[in-house]
A protein has these predicted regions:
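Short glycine/proline-centered loop/turn elements that form peptide/ligand docking sites
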Residues: 28-31, 61
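Conserved non-cysteine loop/helix-boundary elements of the Radical SAM core domain that shape
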Residues: 1-21, 31-52, 72-85
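Auxiliary Fe-S-binding modules of radical SAM enzymes
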Residues: 47-148
């Protein structure tokens, strides 16, 4: 994914917003790096959030609609979408690497396989436990329910 913005530019933008008193809300998309980048995406995202320390953080899970440019990468095999278990693995890696005390965390969008809610860092253990239980039981939202 080429976002057209560097990590440093994200951090500077967050600092400028904070300087004006605007609350910072950030959205991350799980699965954006595909299977090859799962660990790197999770850890780099956690590092960015640790640096930015947003007021709010939302986690979505990648959904590709017909016609999406990334769909060609999936069809050609250059990118493999994450399985539900891998999405939870990525979220687990993120939560074990992030340090953003007080950030309101939500992963309750229709695209997500499970819903999580809490405040970082206080509620990370409970969210990790919910992820582990969901993985053990294969308790994921049905694909057909992941659409709005």
């Amino acid at each position: 994914i080429h976002k057209g913005v560097t990590v440093e530019e994200y951090v500077r933008a967050a600092e400028r917003l904070r300087g004006t008193g605007i609350r910072l809300s950030v959205t991350l998309i799980s699965g954006l790096g595909g299977q090859k980048m799962l660990e790197e995406h999770a850890v780099a995202s956690a590092k960015l959030i640790t640096t930015m320390k947003p007021d709010y953080l939302g986690f979505l899970t990648l959904l590709l609609e017909p016609g999406a440019p990334m769909l060609q990468e999936v069809k050609s095999g250059t990118m493999q979408l994450l399985t539900p278990a891998q999405v939870l693995e990525e979220m687990e890696l993120f939560l074990t690497h992030v340090d953003s005390e007080g950030t309101v965390f939500r992963s309750n969008h229709a695209s997500n396989y499970i819903s999580l809610a809490g405040n970082l860092n206080r509620d990370i253990p409970a969210m990790l436990e919910k992820i582990q239980k969901s993985r053990e039981r294969d308790a994921f939202k049905n694909e057909s329910m992941r659409r709005l």
